[in-house]
Amino acid sequence: MENQNRQNASQCPFHGSITNQSSNRTTNKDWWPNQLNLSILHQHDRKTNPHDEEFDYAAEFQKLDYWALKEDLRKLMTESQDWWPADYGHYGPLFIRMAWHSAGTYRIGDGRGGASTGTQRFAPLNSWPDNANLDKARRLLWPIKKKYGNKISWADLFILAGNVAIESMGGKTIGFGGGRVDVWHPEEDIYWGAEKEWLASERHSDDGELEHPLAASVMGLIYVNPEGPDGKPDPKAAARDIRETFRRMGMNDEETVALIAGGHTFGKAHGAGPATHVGPEPEAAPIEAQGLGWMSSYGKGKGSDTITSGIEGAWTPTPTQWDMSYFDMLFGYDWWLTKSPAGAWQWMAVDPNEKDLAPDAEDPSKKVPTMMMTTDLALRFDPEYEKIARRFHQNPEEFAEAFARAWFKLTHRDMGPKTRYLGPEVPKEDFIWQDPIPEVNYELTEAEIEEIKAKILNSGLTVSELVKTAWASASTFRHSDKRGGANGARIRLAPQNEWEVNEPERLAKVLSIYEDIQRELPKKVSIADLIVLGGSAAVEKAARDAGFDVKVPFSPGRGDATQEQTDVESFAVLEPFADGFRNYQKQEYSVPPEELLVDKAQLLGLTAPEMTVLVGGLRVLGANYRDLPHGVFTDRIGVLTNDFFVNLLDMDYEWVPTDSGIYEIRNRKTGEVRWTATRVDLIFGSNSILRSYAEFYAQDDNQEKFVRDFINAWVKVMNADRFDLVKKARESVTA
């Protein structure tokens, strides 16, 4: 028996205190695949972060010898390493691709993706087919990251390396803003598509519309298939995909042409041999590969024998120099269709002059043909793109400026307002895509704040109206790209003042009263501040009426944006098609309402307890869209009680679905309909995790705790976009 036990132990060591973490174990998700995913609300908590709790990246960045770092990066560009030699002796094109692909995952639909958290280090991005061999670029950067340590994040280093690469080859940039803070594990909240295979594309409707909120047209690609849609070499069809993808990144036609032409002025594509020679991506590579993937058995497996995209060749005869040769080649030749040594569709110039041949990546004395991708020829054969491209070709300075500006936008679009930018190269110019807000120059004393709150509460506006307006203004914030929020009071402006969810007629009435109050005040106070202060005053009143005398923290200093500072088309994507906090849903969707609530909470940067307490509080405060009764489980509307949770959990009631999708809350004995609810309301009693929070807040001894937690979560949302407060606090510490 003892020998048998020893044998069993040697076969399976997972017993006792050792837990089997292998992928073949059964998880809750396996048992219940439709289980609500709340983990996205806690994906970046302190437990995953190795820094001390008081670590402040912005403060560390201020200690950085920025110019020394740029010089080290400049030297790196031409310090070719035998383990991964630089094409043409210059790593610049590789680092441009790395930076571009870090930033290029951004999409305006939900603000997710982009360069601001350094997630190219993690799955799935580190193993996307389109990011093949960028693991080598990151390894080349490691000695510099090691040297400068906490003073420069990976996220900032990726983009700065791209900037230095452009500058080192004669290209123009207009600046750099630091401030991107690394995360320490993948961002699980981002939906990259439903496909189960790399390079598959099942994301278009029958009429060809790309699924919201995706921007890339193919799973595992940053943008579009360079060989053409579905691998078909049709430049005009490729132009349609390009236009839609870049539009969903927030780029117009001119910016699109500038980026493609400017980026392809440098470097080459790699397809020296069949893809069968290429090993697994980093996440699938053997442990001894130490995180490096795509190791190739073709020839030397590097240099001129490299296989990456499968397309082979440089675009220009001068692949490490900023010039006009991309357009010279694009418009100077006819192009014939062929396949690369790897079998990918590409185009070759007809009868090229010897001066227009490119150098070999390893041997500059050897000349090789250039090529164009199907997506490059889209710039020649799409009428609108062609107009822009020919204009750039005739105006080199305009092209250089357009590329520099588009590159800055590409690499900074997901950073939010300019107040977050760090470093000596931040451009002085304000850009419309940064959602600029005028600075304010007033301060308010506590006495003045109390006086304004009294005016607001005596204005005839109800607690419900004040809370609704403040929530509508602040809850546009997206933690993903730091856009939206109460600062700027853009709820006064198009398009927000026309959104259905904001009840335009009621909103106009509330704003009119705020404007009257503003005119009556002895000093200029922004409407943005008044909206938030009004909501805070209403919450205080509601808490007092519940028996709790509390203060809602308020920090003045918000500005009022103008319509001229507001890009209507850009802000249109912030319109919520569902807001479970207001029990609003524009129409029926394939995604359940409770999942849309969790997604909204994640974009607001909320935890599951914060989401729970806010929903419960907003219901009893009467914040529902158009005063819908669903989920308002109280007879004391406008009073900040825990009634939502108490009545949700009361076993005197049963919950009965109706044909309209609404649920009736009926007395079990009499059958009387007491309340109505949506799935968003019922999920707090149905989901075991959310029910545990609901039970916590329903306890008799947690009524005050509920009020205080609601206020903390409320203030978090109201101040979500107040990066100026963070900046001022940092400056006061360093002063």
Swiss-Prot record:
<feature type="site" description="Transition state stabilizer">
    <location>
        <position position="97"/>
    </location>
</feature>
<keyword id="KW-0376">Hydrogen peroxide</keyword>
<feature type="cross-link" description="Tryptophyl-tyrosyl-methioninium (Trp-Tyr) (with M-249)">
    <location>
        <begin position="100"/>
        <end position="223"/>
    </location>
</feature>
<feature type="compositionally biased region" description="Polar residues">
    <location>
        <begin position="1"/>
        <end position="26"/>
    </location>
</feature>
<protein>
    <recommendedName>
        <fullName>Catalase-peroxidase</fullName>
        <ecNumber>1.11.1.21</ecNumber>
    </recommendedName>
</protein>
<keyword id="KW-0575">Peroxidase</keyword>
<dbReference type="Pfam" id="PF00141">
    <property type="entry name" value="peroxidase"/>
</dbReference>
<dbReference type="InterPro" id="IPR000763">
    <property type="entry name" value="Catalase_peroxidase"/>
</dbReference>
<dbReference type="InterPro" id="IPR019794">
    <property type="entry name" value="Peroxidases_AS"/>
</dbReference>
<dbReference type="GO" id="GO:0070301">
    <property type="term" value="P:cellular response to hydrogen peroxide"/>
</dbReference>
<feature type="active site" description="Proton acceptor">
    <location>
        <position position="101"/>
    </location>
</feature>
<comment type="similarity">
    <text>Belongs to the peroxidase family. Peroxidase/catalase subfamily.</text>
</comment>
<feature type="binding site" description="axial binding residue">
    <location>
        <position position="264"/>
    </location>
    <ligand>
        <name>heme b</name>
    </ligand>
</feature>
<keyword id="KW-0349">Heme</keyword>
<dbReference type="GO" id="GO:0004096">
    <property type="term" value="F:catalase activity"/>
</dbReference>
<dbReference type="GO" id="GO:0005829">
    <property type="term" value="C:cytosol"/>
</dbReference>
<dbReference type="GO" id="GO:0020037">
    <property type="term" value="F:heme binding"/>
</dbReference>
<comment type="function">
    <text>Bifunctional enzyme with both catalase and broad-spectrum peroxidase activity.</text>
</comment>
<keyword id="KW-0560">Oxidoreductase</keyword>
<keyword id="KW-0408">Iron</keyword>
<dbReference type="GO" id="GO:0042744">
    <property type="term" value="P:hydrogen peroxide catabolic process"/>
</dbReference>
<keyword id="KW-0479">Metal-binding</keyword>
<dbReference type="InterPro" id="IPR002016">
    <property type="entry name" value="Haem_peroxidase"/>
</dbReference>
<feature type="region of interest" description="Disordered">
    <location>
        <begin position="1"/>
        <end position="29"/>
    </location>
</feature>
<comment type="subunit">
    <text>Homodimer or homotetramer.</text>
</comment>
<feature type="cross-link" description="Tryptophyl-tyrosyl-methioninium (Tyr-Met) (with W-100)">
    <location>
        <begin position="223"/>
        <end position="249"/>
    </location>
</feature>
<dbReference type="GO" id="GO:0046872">
    <property type="term" value="F:metal ion binding"/>
</dbReference>
<dbReference type="InterPro" id="IPR010255">
    <property type="entry name" value="Haem_peroxidase_sf"/>
</dbReference>
<dbReference type="InterPro" id="IPR019793">
    <property type="entry name" value="Peroxidases_heam-ligand_BS"/>
</dbReference>
